[in-house]
UniProtKB/Swiss-Prot annotation:
It is an enzyme of class 2 (transferase). This is Lipoyl synthase. InterPro entries: Aldolase_TIM, Elp3/MiaA/NifB-like_rSAM, LIAS_N, Lipoyl_synth, rSAM. Pathway: Protein modification; protein lipoylation via endogenous pathway; protein N(6)-(lipoyl)lysine from octanoyl-[acyl-carrier-protein]. Belongs to the radical SAM superfamily. Lipoyl synthase family.
């Protein structure tokens, strides 16, 4: 029987979506299985999978295996002892992107704290292979903090993705509880370092809300990200993947998300997606286009 608190926090109507399993979605799913690829869309139970795979021709491919060495209390990805690295994965990912005719691909990975380089070399090689085979596909990467190693981060960034995305996930106060093996300041550091290494590559970060944070703490995250030159921010509703994960403390309304987006844009982000169903890679193709337009605009202004 549900508790009184669970009754109060029953999912509101705006979080109920109609699934659209069309031919594009079915084809992409089949392709993923044929090429033995993992996707965070499936592993993390993303609510937007049908829209992204079916309508937008974008996907988030998860490399370095399907088992994460961390056990963040918000995440549905399996945890435990990872498998051996698959050194053929970069070629397989590149060919799959070609066959799926993706306009934009997000390459993410499980945390591999068991590897000295955190998987950076395989990550970088995957970026290079995807670009070699798919020169017109934009590439976004969504790595872990790789233990905070600057050397590992430099290895990854040397492959020059079109967008670097690293998620802050939650506010400073809640970070130890939500993702115990990461730190708030380390995430800010890798975002700052990425921009220092390659100023022309847009940086991006995502925040979940509904874990017990205050509005003031959300604004603090925005300020911290902007202080480290982050260009793009996404804000979405935390949804509990299972009873073992953290409970939802609040469901934000679409109007509240609209206000958060307005504040984020006023604080200087070039682009912000905010909404109940928004996830880190939601409408990622739009974000890379907006970032490219802004880069072009600034280039024109500086030449005048």
């Amino acid at each position: 029987m549900a508790t009184k608190n669970e009754e109060i926090l029953r999912k509101p109507e705006w979080l109920k979506i109609k699934l659209n399993t069309n031919k594009s979605y079915t084809g992409l799913k089949k392709m993923m299985r044929e090429h033995n690829l993992n996707t965070v869309c499936e592993e993390a139970k993303c609510p937007n999978i049908h829209e992204c795979w079916g309508e937008r021709k974008t996907a988030t491919i998860m490399i370095l295996g399907a088992i994460c060495t961390r056990a963040c209390r918000f995440c549905a990805v399996k945890t435990g002892l990872p498998n051996e690295l698959d050194l053929n994965e970069p070629e397989r990912v590149a060919e799959s992107v070609r066959l799926m005719n993706l306009k934009h691909v997000v390459i993410t990975a499980v945390a591999r704290d068991d590897l000295k380089d955190g998987g950076a070399h395989v990550y970088a090689e995957t970026i290079r292979k995807v670009r070699e085979v798919n020169p017109y596909t934009t590439i976004e990467v969504l790595p872990s903090d790789m233990g905070g190693s600057i050397e590992n981060w430099e290895t990854l960034m040397a492959a020059k993705p079109d967008i670097l995305n690293h998620n802050i996930e939650t506010v400073r106060r809640l970070t130890p509880r939500v993702r115990a093996r990461a730190t708030y300041d380390r995430s800010l550091e890798v975002l700052r370092r990425s921009k220092e290494l390659y100023p022309d590559i847009p940086t991006k970060s995502s925040l979940m809300v509904g874990l017990g944070e205050t509005t003031e703490e959300i604004y603090e995250v925005m300020d911290d990200l902007r202080a480290n030159d982050v260009d793009i921010m996404t804000i979405g509703q935390y949804l509990q993947p299972s009873r073992k994960h953290l409970k939802v403390q609040k469901y934000y309304t679409p109007l509240e998300f609209g206000k958060l987006r307005k504040v984020a844009m006023e604080k200087g982000f070039k682009h912000c997606q905010a909404g109940p169903m928004v996830r880190s890679s939601y409408h990622a193709d739009e974000q890379v286009n907006e970032a490219a337009k802004e880069k072009h605009r600034l280039g024109e202004l500086s030449s005048k």
